[in-house]
Amino acid sequence: IDRLAKEGLRYETAWSNPICTPTRVTLLTGQYAFRHGWTHHYDVARKGGDGLKWTTFTTFARVVRSAGYRTAIAGKWQINNLRRQPDALNQHGFDEHCVWPGAEQGFPETGERYFKGYIMTNGRRETVSYGPDTINAFACDFVRRHKDQPFLLYYPMLLTHGPFGATPLNKDNPPQDKATSYAGYVTYMDRLVGQLIDAVDKAGL
């Protein structure tokens, strides 16, 4: 992560919402929360509703795709019910996806995002060993496959969001409190970011 901050583009003045879904909707749409209306955490797949309307909001992914970029999302979504709206990610501008769709009402297996994580890859749903590993492998592969054309990879990572627990690095001696678990999540997230940077380097980008 430190290397990414050093070599990448860093915004030193920025505003964010202090909670997850409003922040991601703001990032996707470029609008303040009081304009787009997402002012609280809202898990659409679990609680119902229409989710983020592509007929109302334009995401940055749609903008860059219209300019000829190949686009993908790797990470979490939660802001549409992808079981009821299976084309939502495409409508929002993503050609490819590998996401945890969010916990879906009536489908308890979808609540898991880490160990035995429930992941959706280009429409295919499956339970995987560890969700962040599957998503990161998809992200690295996307970079390799599209190194010779303009591309956008949007990566709203699962880590370091709760629920807190172990990672593959410390599962044999799992943390006993939130602070230790969070530290383990940060360490594992740093490892995944390193893998992605390596993929970018190996692609010659």
Model-derived features: positions:
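Formylglycine-dependent sulfatase
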Residues: I1-L205
